[in-house]
């Protein structure tokens, strides 16, 4: 796989946006003619663009032009001349349609990405890896490691094991730091820059399953606060560990060159943990921090403590690593870790079909549903009836004992 990025003011941006839309039309015609529809079949092997993820790099000034219903200038790469002018709204509509039609292109918000860049003295961030979680300098890399959040969640008491999670984040930060020395890289340049910056890739998976088990709607203020606090704990603890390693081993080679930039980014992370909107530095768009109104107090305290430590130790010792965390889709390793959901994603279905080794399928309920119903205070008898209904109808709509009004108030929408 590869990531292909194009700046939004590139003269060929419209062709790029519509590239896969047109290729998918060819696939549809071939399938209609009788070719197999599987992604490794002849239809998909015949068309272009199937080995890449495409993204457009969108700067903040485009959205200002969009709000004003203005014209967007497409610039020559060689000398910056305006080659063509298009309506910003028309271009944005095409991007949205293409993403809906064939899932490409994605959007990468160039201004925001570079405002959170820890090492701008090394150059701008121009692209990402194929899954778009790792954003750093050209020709750098990081090794990934993800933690299964469900393993830290006490389903009976609806509590997250903060101490265990912090220990795991510390341990894996050290492991990933060691991996910088042990990893094999595809080129000398990638190897050298990876040694110079020592970027790491600690993340997590199974957030959607953990939220479902706890009885909290994925698209809710409570879920966003919990996810934000857990992410803040992970990243804060990881940078704290990086600073502790720097005290003994020294900071990464390019740290002094980027010291003030990196410390500013660290302070902005701390401001987000405290939801201190006035404390952000050098940001055109200020992010939503952790909302204390919706976040469990023990998670919020752990998040702010982690970032206080990360900033204080970083100011004293620097950091061993230019970046420490990313949240990957975990598509393959998530299966090995027994995750019901990947990365930060919600579960895709309440009812699933399990393929049998001897052939055939049987229908199973999402394994998070029974415990979610228990945490929502349904009795075992009610739980059994709801589960059996869902397996038979593939939906909870119309199920016995389900109060759709109260579920709607909690953020669960009809499905």
Can you say where each PLM-predicted feature lies in the sequence?
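Long, C-terminal-biased catalytic regions of enzyme "large/alpha" subunits
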Residues: 1-415
């Amino acid at each position: 796989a590869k990531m292909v990025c194009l700046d939004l003011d590139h003269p060929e941006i419209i062709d790029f946006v519509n590239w896969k839309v047109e290729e998918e039309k060819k696939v549809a015609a071939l399938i209609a003619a009788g070719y197999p529809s599987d992604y490794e079949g002849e239809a998909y092997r015949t068309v272009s663009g199937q080995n890449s993820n495409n993204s457009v790099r969108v700067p903040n000034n485009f959205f200002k032009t969009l709000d004003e219903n203005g014209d967007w200038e497409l610039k020559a790469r060689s000398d910056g001349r305006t080659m063509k002018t298009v309506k910003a709204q028309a271009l944005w509509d095409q991007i949205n349609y293409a993403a809906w039609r064939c899932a490409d292109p994605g959007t990468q918000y160039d201004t925001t990405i570079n405002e959170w860049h820890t090492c701008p003295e090394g150059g701008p961030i121009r692209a990402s890896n194929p899954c778009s979680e790792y954003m750093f300098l050209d020709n750098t890399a990081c090794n990934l490691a993800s933690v299964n959040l469900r393993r830290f969640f006490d389903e009976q008491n609806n509590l997250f094991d903060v101490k265990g999670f912090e220990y795991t984040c510390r341990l894996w930060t050290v492991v990933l730091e060691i991996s910088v020395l042990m990893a094999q890289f595809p080129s000398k340049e990638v190897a050298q820059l990876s040694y110079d910056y020592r970027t790491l890739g600690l993340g997590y998976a199974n957030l959607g399953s953990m939220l479902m088990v706890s009885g909290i709607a994925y698209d809710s203020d409570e879920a966003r606060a919990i996810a934000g606090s857990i992410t803040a704990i992970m990243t804060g603890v990881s940078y704290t560990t990086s600073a502790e390693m720097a005290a003994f081993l020294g900071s990464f080679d390019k740290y002094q060159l980027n010291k003030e930039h990196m410390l500013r980014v660290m302070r902005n992370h701390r401001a987000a943990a405290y939801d201190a909107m006035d404390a952000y530095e050098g940001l055109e768009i200020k992010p939503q921090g952790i909302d204390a109104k919706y976040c469990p107090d023990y998670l919020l305290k752990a998040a702010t403590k982690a970032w206080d430590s990360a900033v204080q130790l970083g100011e004293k010792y620097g950091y061993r690593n230019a970046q420490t965390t990313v949240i990957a889709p975990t598509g393959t390793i998530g299966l090995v870790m027994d995750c019901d959901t990947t990365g930060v994603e919600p579960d895709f279905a309440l009812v699933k079909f399990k393929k049998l080794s001897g052939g055939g399928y049987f229908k199973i309920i999402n394994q998070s549903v029974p415990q979610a119903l228990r945490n929502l205070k349904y009795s075992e008898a009610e739980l059994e009836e709801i589960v059996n209904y869902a397996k038979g109808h593939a939906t909870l709509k119309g199920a016995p004992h389900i109060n759709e009004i109260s579920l709607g108030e909690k953020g669960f929408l009809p499905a």
